[in-house]
UniProtKB/Swiss-Prot annotation:
It comes from the Bacteria. GO terms for biological process: gluconeogenesis; glycolytic process. Monomer. Belongs to the phosphoglycerate kinase family. SUPFAM superfamilies: Phosphoglycerate kinase (SSF53748). The gene is pgk. This is Phosphoglycerate kinase. Its EC number is 2.7.2.3. InterPro entries: Phosphoglycerate_kinase (IPR001576), Phosphoglycerate_kinase_CS (IPR015911), Phosphoglycerate_kinase_N (IPR015824), Phosphoglycerate_kinase_sf (IPR036043).
Length: 403
């Protein structure tokens, strides 16, 4: 793939030029306070390289899923503040995405300045299914950069989206990949292009339907496929076990039966489950055998015996990819499974495995549970994007840069 890189743009020279950077700054907030700044930190190397080279940087990003511009809880104001602190310079926030204020502020930028546009998803054209509407917003964003602008794609968490600020704008300006996207593609390729064996994949999360494509794509290629989290109950049901009130996708039972029959030597399911009476942090709970979940109880975490088995299967692996927690880690009583799996992967990494934490909830989980990023080979910033790449899908936001 012939994609131009940020290093190429810096070589061409950016002093005095407006550069639009699409970053992924979609950080978790609680009462307008950022609880995990990981994605902001991951975007800094690209922004800093541009400001230090004298570019006038305009950052486009989204936060959450706002219904309208009046949805002020999704304003990027806390992100502008966090960027200002981390860059040690004032980062202005435009009050709109591509309107009058954005233009005025973009025109007023000096070399090395940074402007953050308001949440691009405040503009319904960003995610429009109508190509012409997206193109229109993309043209307005490109216009912010004037006559000699450039576009840098550095939001790995959104490159699987065909959206105006990710895909369409890349066709309007000279386009480059930023340091983060370059690093993500390089690291994830170690799981897709001839990975070292034994290769183990751990999949958690709630729905089989969300991960079915990945499971089908990976099962023939991997040596071990560990399945936990909410989606394991549909697999347990497919084995003929009762699952009580646990999360269950009836429509996926036959798919799970087929997978279990074809890959019985590779698929590893929990042997014990921590069950609770209700989906609540303080609910009554106990550990039961995977085939012993009674009515009135729901599976909320992976049991200690299962985690021990998972660890044994991961021991000696050369490549490990993990996406999705294996329990309700947000509740302390049900975080042990996810923590235990993270410990097993960290241990395997210490012993020479190349490990990737595939973004999204898994990345938040390992950080919230106190693991240093260095405990793993790579923590991806993109949940959906990393899964689609692992599955072998084309990422529109990357493919569009290949010119």
């Amino acid at each position: 793939m012939a994609v131009k890189k940020l290093a190429d743009l810096l070589k061409e020279g950016v002093e005095g030029r407006h550069v639009l950077v699409r970053a992924d700054l979609n950080v978790p907030l609680k009462d307008k306070v950022i609880t995990d700044p990981g994605r902001i930190d991951a975007s800094l190397p690209t922004i800093k390289a541009l400001t230090e080279a004298g570019a006038r940087v305009i950052v486009a990003a989204h936060l959450g899923r706002p219904k309208s511009p009046q949805d002020t809880q999704f304003s990027l104001a806390p992100v502008a503040e966090a960027l200002s602190q981390r860059l040690d310079q004032y980062v202005a926030l435009a009050s709109d995405v591509s309107g009058e204020d954005a233009h005025e502020r973009a025109n007023g930028l000096n070399d090395g300045d940074v402007l953050l546009l308001e949440n691009v998803r405040f503009d319904p054209r960003e995610k429009s299914k109508n190509d012409a509407e997206r193109e229109e917003l993309a043209s307005e964003l490109a216009a912010l950069t004037g006559d000699n602008g450039a576009f840098v794609s550095d939001g790995f968490g959104v490159v699987h989206r065909k959206q105006a600020s990710v895909y369409d704008v890349a066709k309007k300006l000279p386009a480059y990949v930023g340091y983060l996207v370059e690093k993500e593609l390089e690291q994830l390729s170690k799981c897709t292009d001839d990975p070292q064996h034994p290769y183990a994949v751990c999949l958690g999360g709630s729905k089989v339907s969300d991960k079915l494509g990945v499971i089908k794509a990976l099962a023939p290629k991997v040596d071990t496929l560990i399945i936990g989290g909410g989606m394991c109950y549909t697999f347990l049901k497919a084995k003929g076990y009762g699952v009580g009130d646990s999360l269950l996708e009836e429509s996926m039972i036959d798919e799970c039966k087929n997978l279990l029959s074809e890959y019985s030597d590779k698929i590893v399911l929990p042997s014990d489950i921590v069950v609770g009476k209700e989906f609540d942090a303080n609910t009554e709970h106990k550990t039961v055998s995977a085939d012993g979940i009674e009515d009135g109880w729901m599976g909320l975490d992976t049991g200690a015996e299962s985690i021990k088995t998972f660890g044994e299967r991961l021991n000696g692996a050369k490549t490990i990819f993990w996406n999705g927690p294996v329990g309700v880690f947000e509740f302390e009583a049900f975080a042990n499974g996810t923590k235990g799996l993270a410990e097993a992967i960290a241990e395997a990494t210490k012993n020479g495995a190349f490990s990737v934490i595939g973004g999204g909830d898994s990345a938040s989980a390992v950080r919230n549970l106190g693991f240093a990023d260095e405990a793993f080979s790579h923590i991806s910033t993109g949940g959906g994007a990393s899964l689609e790449l692992i599955e072998g899908k084309t990422l529109p936001g990357v493919a569009v840069l290949d010119r």
